[in-house]
UniProtKB/Swiss-Prot annotation:
One of its GO terms (biological process) is cytochrome complex assembly. Disulfide bonds: none annotated. HAMAP family: CytC_CcsA. It comes from Hordeum vulgare. The gene is ccsA. Keywords: Chloroplast, Cytochrome c-type biogenesis, Membrane, Plastid, Thylakoid, Transmembrane, Transmembrane helix. GO terms for cellular component: chloroplast thylakoid membrane; plasma membrane. The keyword Iron does not apply. GO terms for molecular function: heme binding. This is Cytochrome c biogenesis protein CcsA. It comes from the Eukaryota.
Length: 322
């Protein structure tokens, strides 16, 4: 009872904090004079991280196994993984371009996990025999870490497509200022504008194209690095799952719906990484492939759980009639 109460408190603290964080983030986008509030949002993300970590540890101690046995626990772990990605730019002492992706993603996963739809999964239960293995932590954690990384990388690629295909792209138009112009990738304007002295010889109309090129190149670089990391984690997760499947079911691969879509996901991002070796496919073409991968990941992770079919149906989400 004590652990259940603690988990309930920590979960709602993390959700409430991340809600405040995203509100602050939106305010700073709309009102540039309140830019100092970003420090508060970063502190809020730290509180969220420790709350989610506390929940996972509490769940681990109370249940006796790593908390990855159902959709509810995996969503909490996914939000924790998104925060880890949120801290990567800080470790590299670079601008946190990922915050506009990781913060909303965290609140969405956290919000769905704490919603009434998954109430029956909130209580920890004894593992089913198929999950009573040391491979549980290795396989599932690698898969969820890869999902979080690939989702962020795919969203960055989608941002590239939005920038390149957006009509009437003007950075300095006073009549067309909106939230999109002030999100993480457009905030780079201030950085380049500070160095405008080196570009005084260039005509004014060339500025938007120059900024557009610089921003897309930066996003493309981030997307490639994050997807490369996610692809590596996905490969490790699939290999661990194959070994575990051989121990549990006597076969490395069974073409279960979850396994099939994991293979499709792996193939899509393998094509993306291969396309990066061809200069003609870099940029828009590779970003399009990664954007398709975004939908494939959600089908693999969430869609199969909705159907509740196959060998991976335990811990799935089903709507119960009232």
């Amino acid at each position: 009872m004590l652990f259940a109460t603690l988990e309930h408190i920590l979960t709602h603290i993390s959700f409430s904090t991340i809600s405040i964080v995203i509100t602050i983030h939106l305010i700073t986008l709309l009102v540039r004079e309140l830019g100092r509030l970003r420090d508060s949002s970063e502190k809020g993300m730290i509180v969220t991280f420790f709350s989610i970590t506390g929940f996972l540890v509490s769940r681990w101690v109370s249940s006796g196994h790593f908390p990855l046995s159902n959709l509810y626990e995996s969503l909490i772990f996914l939000s924790w993984a998104l925060y880890i990605l949120h801290t990567i730019p800080k470790i590299q002492n670079s601008k946190n371009d990922l915050s506009t992706i990781t913060t909303p993603s965290t609140i969405l996963t956290q919000g769905f996990a704490t919603s009434g739809l998954l109430t029956e999964m909130h209580q920890s239960t004894i593992l089913v025999p198929a999950l009573q293995s040391q491979w549980l932590m290795m396989h599932v954690s690698m898969m969820l870490l890869s999902y979080a990384t690939l989702l962020c990388g795919s969203l960055l690629s989608a941002a590239i497509l939005i920038i390149r295909f957006r009509n009437n792209f003007h950075f300095f138009s006073k009549k067309k200022k909106n939230v999109l112009n002030k999100t993480f990738f457009f905030s780079e304007i201030a950085f380049f504008y500070a160095k405008r002295s080196a570009l005084k010889s260039a005509p004014v109309p060339s500025f938007p194209n120059y900024y557009k090129y610089q921003l897309t190149e930066r996003l493309d670089s981030w997307s490639y690095r994050i997807i490369s990391l996610g692809f590596t984690l996905l490969t490790i997760g699939i290999l661990c799952g194959a070994v575990w499947a051989n121990e549990a079911w006597g076969s490395y691969w069974n073409w279960d719906p979850k396994e099939t879509w994991a293979f499709i996901t792996w193939t899509i991002f393998a094509i993306y990484l291969h396309s990066r070796t061809n200069p003609n496919w870099k940029g828009t073409n590779s970003a399009l492939i990664a954007s398709i991968g975004f939908l494939i990941i959600w089908i693999c992770y969430f869609g199969i759980n909705l159907l509740g079919i196959g060998l991976h149906s335990y811990g799935s989400f089903t709507l119960t009639p009232k």
